[in-house]
A protein has these predicted regions:
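Short beta-strand-centered aromatic/proline hotspots
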Residues: 50-65
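Intrinsically disordered, low-complexity, charged/polar segments
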Residues: 78-128
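Hydrophobic beta-strand positions in blades of beta-propellers and related beta-sheet-rich domains
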Residues: 56, 74-76, 82
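Short, surface-exposed beta-edge/turn micro-motifs
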Residues: 35-38, 53-56, 71-72
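Short coil-to-beta transition motif at edge beta-strands of beta-rich domains
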Residues: 29-48
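Mixed-charge, Lys/Arg-rich low-complexity intrinsically disordered regions
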Residues: 2-35
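Short, solvent-exposed secondary-structure boundary/capping segments
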Residues: 65-78
């Protein structure tokens, strides 16, 4: 597994990403996910220590293009790393609007440093 920040590792451990969940790299395009998906990535924001920190993100709208700048944008809510989460709570974050409005963010796709990753729930096994 790739090396993630301590905050990301703790988040993944809380939501059971090794058991019921899986982490996959997704393209930096409108097929990166749908509303309610949890993504995480490193984002270039200035220079110096901490300028490329990991962000955990609840997607509300896949990539859109800004008419003025031509930038591809990713919109949604920043998920606080220090919260307490379970696989079930991740599913309800989007539906129940549990994130504070001041956490709403728009990220420029070209400033995402490295791969864009999505946390996906594994489909249940079919028992015959």
């Amino acid at each position: 597994m790739a090396k993630f920040s301590k905050g990301i590792q703790n988040f993944l451990a809380q939501v059971g990403a090794n058991d019921d969940m899986r982490i996959s790299m997704v393209p930096k395009s409108d097929s990166c996910g749908g509303p309610g998906d949890i993504l995480f990535f490193r984002y270039k924001l200035g220079t110096g220590r901490g300028s490329r920190a990991f962000r955990i993100f609840l997607l509300t709208e896949p990539v859109t293009k800004d008419a003025k700048t031509g930038n591809q944008l990713l919109t949604g809510f920043k998920v606080p790393e220090d919260g307490t989460y379970t696989p079930e709570s991740l599913e309800s974050l989007y539906n129940n609007s549990e994130l504070p409005e001041d956490g709403y963010r728009t990220y420029i796709m070209s400033n995402i440093f490295g791969p864009l990753r999505k946390i996906s729930k594994n489909p249940p096994e079919v028992v015959e």
